Amino acid sequence: MPSFIKSVTFDCADPIALATFWAAALGSNVDEDSTAEQAFVEAPGWGGPNIWFNKVPEPKTAKNRVHFDLRAPDTIDAEVARLEALGATVTRRGEDIVVMIDVEGNEFCVE
C-alpha cells in the first residue's frame, strides 16, 4: 500500500492568523487546541490533508517551492473577491488562473 499525505505544514510568524485565514478560505475551523506556537486546521469535507502552522523565528525569504491550487466553487472572480476580503492579495492575473498571496505572503493559485 502506498503512502498518503496526512498533513501539510507551514512555517510562519503567526500560526493563529495564518490558520484563521486558511480555515476561512477552505471552509473549516481552527482547532480549539491551537496556540501561538502551533495551530491546526482539519481538512473540511473535501477529505484532503490537514494543515499545521508552526511558529518559526525566521521570515519567509523566497518564493514557495510548493503551493496550493484552489478550484473556485463558482466564478474565479467571485472566489478571488472572497479571498481578498479574508486578507489575500492578487499578484498576477492570467486568462484562467489568478495567483494570490495569503496574509504571510505564501503564494497560491485560484482556478
Predicted features by range, described:
Residues 1-34, 42-92, 101-111:
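Glyoxalase I/VOC metalloenzyme domain signal
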Residues 95-97:
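Short loop/turn microsegments at loop-to-beta-strand junctions
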